[in-house]
Amino acid sequence: ETYDAYEKRGISREIFRDTFYDLTFWCENCFLEYGEYGIDEYDWFFRHMKLTIFRLGRMQFEIMDSRWNFTAGERMVKKGDPIISIHIPQGEKLTLESVRESIIQGMAFWGKEMPYLCHSWLLYPGLKDILPEKSNIIMFQNQFQIVETDWDEREAEWRIWGKVQRNLNVYSENTSLQRAAKKYMAQDSKGKII
């Protein structure tokens, strides 16, 4: 059914495949967190079925109503205004070239009339304190104007370690990002990275 809807709208088989490959990541995440394969992000996949989110290159682009009031440049966006939300799926390096190519593809697909917004832990300003200036994450951040920081989220911990823990000491230190994030959380940042 969903594939038929893609065909009716003239959306390529490649975009369908890339968009639905997302299921693989969420199944893997479920295994990491619970020890069995499955999907516990049901509401996320309605977006795929309703054809509101598409993977175009490295990133996903979703048409949605803004959940926030914000000003970007000279443009005011009110809660409920249509926007294109940019999501960063796991699984591949986030190179500057892949980000730029993906944004070009997103704008070719959705147009340039609506504002584009990214609500991600990768944009947390404190990452500039722990990562090298030339890291892919910092180069990604530099593509955006940071409008606001969401202090209530703990997605970074989940993304960096696969699970949010109450005790900071149980977090592994297998990668440079894990080591830097754990040290940062221990020193400051209210014990978390957004």
Placement of each model-derived feature along the sequence:
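Well-ordered, non-membrane alpha-helical segments in soluble/globular domains
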Residues: 95-110
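An acidic- and aromatic-residue-enriched active-site/binding cleft used to recognize and process polar
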Residues: 121-124
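Non-catalytic substrate-recognition and accessory regions of acyl/acetyltransferase enzymes
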Residues: 1-94, 111-115, 126-194
